[in-house]
From Swiss-Prot:
Biased composition range(s): Basic residues: 117-126
Organism placement in taxonomy: Eukaryota, Fungi, Dikarya, Ascomycota, Pezizomycotina
Native species: Aspergillus clavatus (strain ATCC 1007 / CBS 513.65 / DSM 816 / NCTC 3887 / NRRL 1 / QM 1276 / 107)
Any single biological process term in GO: maturation of SSU-rRNA from tricistronic rRNA transcript (SSU-rRNA, 5.8S rRNA, LSU-rRNA)
Protein name stated in the entry: rRNA biogenesis protein rrp36
Free-text function comment from the UniProt entry: Component of the 90S pre-ribosome involved in the maturation of rRNAs. Required for early cleavages of the pre-RNAs in the 40S ribosomal subunit maturation pathway.
Source domain of life: Eukaryota
Coiled-coil blocks: 242-300
Entry's family note: Belongs to the RRP36 family.
């Protein structure tokens, strides 16, 4: 019954972290099972030794009693054979009773444990002990591994396989858990392969005319890329519009009698006049620069100069002023010079200290602080 209980015992696998405890328990159980098996084997060996002693005694009695008849020897042999048969029958009954209590799972494990390795061992033992049949049977019985040993070996192999398989499985799980990117802030990897659209343009639609801005049109700007010159030429008509507008504003200012409207018209006339004057001054500066560059290039080509001379801002301003006065008439030039003289005089007077400013009335009131004279406001 001990063998059936051991075979019916089921093995329960524990988690990996409890393997050491489980292995210790299984080792203790295996030691207890080995002790039980050793005890059973010792009992069998004692029985066999007793039988051997009995046979020896019977043989001694036969050798000592030479006068006994052949019938007594036959009877003793028959009795010994009957004893052997009875012992074999009792052992077979015990084995049958124990096997009847073994579960199908234990039988399947025992059958699986008897693999080709065990069969090769049995064949080798049969071939080596073919001389003596009885001794051969005893040696086979002694050399054949017990089902419990095979089950223990099978369990050990399963544990080792489980330990070896758990490491790659854990690594695979870790690899599967790893994200596709190194970090969540890293850019995502996207395949460049995209499905081609099945739509095909058989007939091209007519081209739609797009609006063009003449300021950025290459036809207006010219091939040389001189943007300012092209724009000035393209929008030269605006200067004529501004001149006509100034003329209309002056006529309206002469006809109107409303003071508020006159103030508005006066402000508009001043703004338009300043805009036209600024445009004219810029145009005059460009002309002066163009003439100077042309003159310098000509001198370099003639060999009179090796390096060009670039005008300073003060010299450019003087040449622009000379050109302005040359383009005026005699009366306009006189009036312009008078206005400029007054302007320069006022500017110099402002820069002078109060004590040096010329006043007609020397008895003008001074400040209470004891400083210079007070500045008179012009009406």
């Amino acid at each position: 019954m001990a063998i059936s209980d051991l075979l019916n015992r089921r093995v329960r696998a524990l988690p990996e972290e409890d393997e050491e405890v489980y292995s210790g328990e299984s080792a203790s159980e295996a030691e207890s099972n080995d002790e039980q098996i050793d005890e059973s084997r010792s009992d069998d060996s004692s029985d066999e030794s007793l039988e051997d002693h009995g046979g020896a005694r019977s043989n001694g009695s036969e050798l000592s009693d030479d006068d006994e008849a052949d019938e007594d020897s036959n009877i003793s042999e028959d009795s010994a054979a009957d004893d052997d048969d009875e012992s074999d029958a009792s052992e077979a009954d015990d084995m049958q009773a124990s096997l009847s209590h073994i579960s199908f799972g234990a039988l399947a494990k025992a059958q699986a444990s008897l693999g080709p390795h065990a069969k090769r061992k049995l064949k080798h033992s049969k071939a080596s002990t073919a001389a003596d049949a009885a001794d051969d049977d005893d040696e086979k019985a002694a050399a054949a591994p017990s089902p419990l040993d095979d089950i223990r070996a099978r369990i050990r192999e399963a544990r080792e396989q489980k330990r070896q398989g758990s490491a790659p499985s854990a690594s695979k799980a870790r690899d599967a858990e790893k994200p596709s990117r190194s970090s969540k802030h890293a850019p995502m990897v996207q395949s460049s392969k995209h499905a081609v659209s099945r739509k095909r343009t058989i007939i091209e639609p007519p081209a739609v005319l797009k609006s063009r801005d003449p300021r950025f049109d290459p036809a207006v700007r010219g091939q040389g890329g001189s943007r300012d010159g092209g724009i000035n030429k393209a929008y030269a008509f605006l200067d004529e519009y501004r001149a006509n507008e100034l003329k209309e504003l002056k006529e309206k200012f002469a006809k109107t009698k409303d003071l508020r409207e006159k103030e508005d018209l006066k402000r508009a006339i001043r703004a338009t006049t300043d805009r036209l004057r600024t445009t004219e001054n810029r145009r005059r500066e460009k002309e002066v620069l163009a003439e100077h560059k042309k003159r310098e290039k000509q001198l370099i080509l003639e060999g009179k100069k090796s390096n060009p001379y670039f005008l300073k801002k003060s010299e450019l301003k003087k040449q622009v002023l000379v050109k302005k006065y040359e383009s005026m008439g005699s009366r306009q030039r006189v009036k312009a010079l008078e206005r400029r003289q007054k302007k320069m005089t006022a500017k110099e007077r402002k820069e002078m200290p109060m004590e040096r400013r010329g006043f007609e009335n020397d008895a003008a009131p001074f400040n209470n602080d004891g400083g210079g004279r007070k500045r008179r406001k012009l009406a």
